[in-house]
């Protein structure tokens, strides 16, 4: 098996064809030999019987054996006679030979018991013969006609060989033609392999499937789809890396400035304390940004969800509201949960769905003014998170969800990744996210299924 795996497709197909052709030829030879020998036996047995009947119609009382048993030449002017093809002898009932063909007939042993077809041997000869014994109508004579088995076998072999040897001779020609045709048919695959070797790693150009066999075309199409996905992923990763580097530069620069301020404030405890507090706040923002970057990177690499389960959405929303409640109270914001339906369940990854709801609530609390309310409403086919903030402009609304995008004029801290994470998690779960300005005022996010 390992040896055949190292062979080329052309060689393997040629070997398969050669093996199948050889097996077919052998089976055909066996079947032809069997049928031919049966037909030859039937034909010559009939010939023996007819010749014996013709001899039995002679006037055997008038036969002069001395005049008729002289040998005749086997080679004539325009042909050749095989002395094994046919022989005969005529005996009296007491076993005295009165006539034979002058060749092998004189060596046929007499048998007074046999009648019909029987196998036997000549006197002094080990070769097998086929005999037919018959008694004359008057009962005075015994007639025997014989033929050597080897003659029949040679005849059958000659017939079979005449039919099958031309096919055996044609087999090498067929192999050569097959290898040439395979080489021509596999040429598009060789071009395809060359194109793959010369291809740039980040190229999105699809492979040319012209001339490719239909059996291989799905592979080429799958490769083109893979190249497109790989290119899109590389573009996304490059943009992500560039945006991440840009977003991290500002908080890191701010941390450096606050560190320098703290170092220069040894004589002013109040200024030093303020600088350390701002440094701590900057570290928190940088930590949050890094966490969101890592989360988004992991989500981008996911194609299928693992460890999924049936999740009651009312329990998910209640636990998420309880998690954000303390932070909302510190910001003097009230969070209200309204369950218009009960028993709604969704199949998904619990941690990711919890992260989706938490990001929506965190975004609503972060951008809502003090004294406002964040409403969370569960319906039969969606849930809505709505705040009482100022909302966003139509221009900004069109870009909501883009990575690192924050509407202009925002005073609250943020990285612009929270809603991107929400969209990615929703897509993995087959959900749809819509952002818009609420009719009652404020910004709302609707997650539907």
From Swiss-Prot:
It catalyses: ATP + protein L-histidine = ADP + protein N-phospho-L-histidine. Keywords: ATP-binding, Cell inner membrane, Cell membrane, Kinase, Membrane, Nucleotide-binding, Phosphoprotein, Transferase, Transmembrane, Transmembrane helix, Two-component regulatory system. InterPro entries: 2CSK_N, HATPase_C_sf, His_kinase_dom, HisK_dim/P_dom, HisK_dim/P_sf, Sig_transdc_His_kin-like_C, TCS_sensor_his_kinase. GO terms for cellular component: plasma membrane. Induction: By the AI-2 quorum sensing system. Residues 243-449 form the Histidine kinase domain. The keyword Signal does not apply. The chain crosses the membrane at residues 13-33, 157-177. The modification Phosphohistidine is found at residue 246. It is found in: Cell inner membrane. It is a multi-pass membrane protein. Residues 34-156 are periplasmic. The keyword Iron-sulfur does not apply. NCBIfam families: PRK10337.1. PANTHER family: SENSOR HISTIDINE KINASE YKOH, SENSOR PROTEIN QSEC. This is Sensor protein QseC. It comes from Escherichia coli O157:H7.
